[in-house]
C-alpha cells in the first residue's frame, strides 16, 4: 500500500499540471517583489500638497483686504474724520462744529429767549387759562403771550382740504370726545410720532412771524402723549413749565415725565 502511494506521488510530481503549478508558486515571490520595488510615479512626487507660496499669497491678499476695510471704517468714524478736518477750522469754529454734532438743533433754543408753558388739561378750564395768561405775561395787556390749542390745530387741519396733514389725521382718527379734559382727539398707532409737535411748531413760527412781540406761549391740551412730549423737547423747544389744576392730574404719565425734572406746578 505504501509503495503504491509513493509511486502515485512520483507520477503526480512529474505530471504537466503539477509542474505548471509549482512554477507559478516559485515565480510569485519575484513578481511581488518587483511590484513593490517599483519607484513612485512622477505624478505622486509632484503632488507635494499645498506649497508655502500658496499660503503666502492667501495671507498677502487677506492682509490687503483687512487694511482696506479698516481704512474705510476710519473714514466713516466721526472722531477720526473730524480730526482730519480740524486743520481747516479755527478753534472757535471747531468747538461750535463739535457742539452742533452733539445735539440736534431745536427750532427755538435758549438763545430765542422764549418761554413755553404746557397745559395738558386745558379743555374744560377757560377761566384758569385767562389766569395763566396774566400770570406768565410781563405786560398788563398780555400782548406778549400767545396761545396754541392742539384741539383747534387738529380741527383746522382736518377741515382743510388742502392741508398736508388733514387726510392723514382723518384716516387715523379713532375718536373725538368733546368731554375730554385734554386733547379730545385720539388716533391709532399708524399716525407717525411727532406730527403734533410739527403742527405746534409750524403754528408757533407763524405767530412769531406775524407778531414778533410774542415771547410767552401757552400750549393747551399739549403734549397729548409721552412720545410727543419727548419729540417736542428734542426738535422744537424746552418746556419751561407744565401746569396742572389739581393733584389727580399729576398721575398722568406725561405729567410724571416732567415731574422728574421738577417742571410741574399746580395752578388754582
From Swiss-Prot:
Listed transmembrane segments: 54-70
Membrane topology: Single-pass membrane protein
Domain of life: Eukaryota
Signal peptide: none
Transit peptide residue numbers: 1-36
Keywords: Membrane, Mitochondrion, Transit peptide, Transmembrane, Transmembrane helix
Localisation: Mitochondrion membrane
GO cellular component annotations of the record: mitochondrial membrane
Family the UniProt entry places it in: Belongs to the AIM36 family.
Name this protein carries in UniProt: Altered inheritance of mitochondria protein 36, mitochondrial
Organism for this UniProt entry: Komagataella phaffii (strain GS115 / ATCC 20864)
Amino acid at each position: 500500500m505504501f509503495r503504491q502511494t509513493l509511486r502515485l506521488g512520483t507520477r503526480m510530481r512529474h505530471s504537466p499540471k503539477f509542474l505548471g503549478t509549482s512554477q507559478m508558486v516559485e515565480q510569485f515571490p519575484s513578481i511581488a517583489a518587483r511590484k513593490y520595488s517599483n519607484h513612485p510615479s512622477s505624478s505622486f512626487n509632484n503632488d507635494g500638497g499645498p506649497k508655502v507660496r500658496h499660503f503666502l499669497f492667501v495671507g498677502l491678499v487677506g492682509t490687503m483686504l483687512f487694511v482696506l476695510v479698516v481704512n474705510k471704517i476710519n473714514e466713516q468714524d466721526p472722531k477720526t474724520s473730524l480730526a482730519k478736518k480740524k486743520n481747516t477750522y479755527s478753534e472757535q469754529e471747531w468747538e461750535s462744529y463739535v457742539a452742533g454734532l452733539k445735539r440736534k438743533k431745536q427750532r427755538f433754543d435758549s438763545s430765542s429767549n422764549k418761554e413755553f408753558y404746557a397745559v395738558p388739561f386745558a379743555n374744560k378750564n377757560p377761566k384758569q387759562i385767562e389766569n395763566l395768561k396774566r400770570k406768565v405775561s410781563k405786560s398788563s395787556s398780555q400782548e406778549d403771550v400767545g396761545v396754541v390749542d392742539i384741539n383747534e390745530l387738529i380741527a383746522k387741519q382736518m377741515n382743510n382740504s388742502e392741508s398736508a396733514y388733514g387726510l392723514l389725521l382723518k384716516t387715523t382718527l379713532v375718536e373725538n370726545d368733546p368731554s375730554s379734559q385734554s386733547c379730545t382727539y385720539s388716533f391709532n398707532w399708524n399716525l407717525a410720532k411727532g406730527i403734533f409737535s410739527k403742527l405746534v411748531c409750524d403754528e408757533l413760527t407763524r405767530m412769531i412771524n406775524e407778531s414778533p412781540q410774542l415771547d410767552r406761549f401757552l400750549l393747551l391740551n399739549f403734549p397729548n402723549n409721552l412720545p410727543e412730549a419727548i419729540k417736542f423737547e428734542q426738535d422744537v423747544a424746552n418746556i419751561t413749565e407744565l401746569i396742572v389744576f389739581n393733584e389727580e392730574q399729576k398721575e398722568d404719565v406725561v405729567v410724571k415725565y416732567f415731574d422728574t425734572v421738577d417742571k410741574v406746578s399746580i395752578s388754582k
